[in-house]
């Protein structure tokens, strides 16, 4: 299925993931789904991200607070997850385009500072936007 993957500190990117094992690899463990959006989409994240000490990732709307560790946004079918539409991919890449640094919280509302994300290169190769060719 086609999803948008969001890693702490990095720009979101489109990817294909298939099956429970790959979903768990993306989030680093047991999956928890939350439904902060008005359209048929979900955030799938690590159920124990904060307990495992995963880094803060992004704020999510709808009173859910923030997500710790990597997550992906996927579509919702009748009974399970499914691919996002092209419009949803564009919308969620825009929604999560800025990385965030957690400064504090008021109740369940995170107080964050939005920062420029690091760019994600080809799969498995993550580069900062400040990396220059020939200086690797």
PLM features: what roles do these ranges have?
Residues 35-38:
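Catalytic phosphate/metal-binding cores of nucleic-acid and nucleotide-processing enzymes, i.e., regions
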Residues 31-33, 45:
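Short, surface-exposed polybasic-aromatic patches that bind anionic ligands, especially phosphate groups
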Residues 119-136:
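Non-Sec secretion/translocation targeting segments of pathogen effectors
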Residues 82-123:
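Extended coiled-coil/helical scaffolds and adjacent low-complexity linkers that mediate multimerization
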Residues 43-50:
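Short helix/strand-capping turn motifs
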Residues 63-86:
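Helix-rich interaction surfaces within compact, conserved domain-sized segments
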Residues 1-11, 135-136:
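Short, extreme N-terminal segment that most often corresponds to the first beta-strand
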């Amino acid at each position: 299925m086609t999803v948008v993957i969001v890693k702490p500190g990095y720009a979101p990117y489109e990817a294909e993931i298939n099956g429970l094992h790959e979903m768990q690899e993306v989030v680093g463990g047991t999956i928890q789904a939350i439904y902060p959006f008005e359209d048929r989409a979900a955030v799938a994240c690590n159920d124990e991200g904060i307990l495992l000490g995963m880094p803060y990732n992004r704020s999510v709307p709808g009173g859910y607070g923030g997500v710790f560790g990597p997550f992906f946004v996927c579509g919702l079918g009748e009974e399970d997850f499914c691919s996002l539409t092209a419009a949803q991919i564009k919308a969620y890449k825009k929604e999560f385009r800025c990385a965030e640094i957690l400064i504090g919280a008021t109740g369940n509302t995170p107080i964050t500072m939005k920062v420029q994300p690091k760019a994600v290169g080809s799969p498995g190769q993550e580069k900062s936007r400040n990396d220059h060719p020939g200086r690797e």
